[in-house]
């Protein structure tokens, strides 16, 4: 059961990455693409996929600014990405900072 679920998850990640090319996120798209296709369970991979979805949804909302369900979906995606970034910053600061640079996104606010 676990093996089937893992294969399905990897297949879905590959399909998502092919459907939404890496040119919408940051400058290191090609290297990120090959890295993230191998292991879809990595926190970095999940953040990368969420960043792709955020970019796509943001461009949709520029044209359809009254699409409130998409606005809600965007807020949910941003919250999930924020939680994953917080987890990664607590676990490994070096990986966290490298990911921020690769994806070209801002980090968490420091209090």
From Swiss-Prot:
One of its GO terms (molecular function) is structural constituent of ribosome. Transmembrane segments: none annotated. Gene3D superfamilies: S15/NS1, RNA-binding. The keyword Chloroplast applies. It holds the Pfam family Ribosomal_S15. GO terms for biological process: translation. It is found in: Plastid, Chloroplast. Signal peptide: none annotated. Disulfide bonds: none annotated. InterPro entries: Ribosomal_uS15, Ribosomal_uS15_bac-type, uS15_NS1_RNA-bd_sf. Keywords: Chloroplast, Plastid, Ribonucleoprotein, Ribosomal protein. This is Small ribosomal subunit protein uS15c. It comes from Staurastrum punctulatum (Green alga). The lineage of its organism: Eukaryota, Viridiplantae, Streptophyta, Zygnematophyceae, Zygnematophycidae.
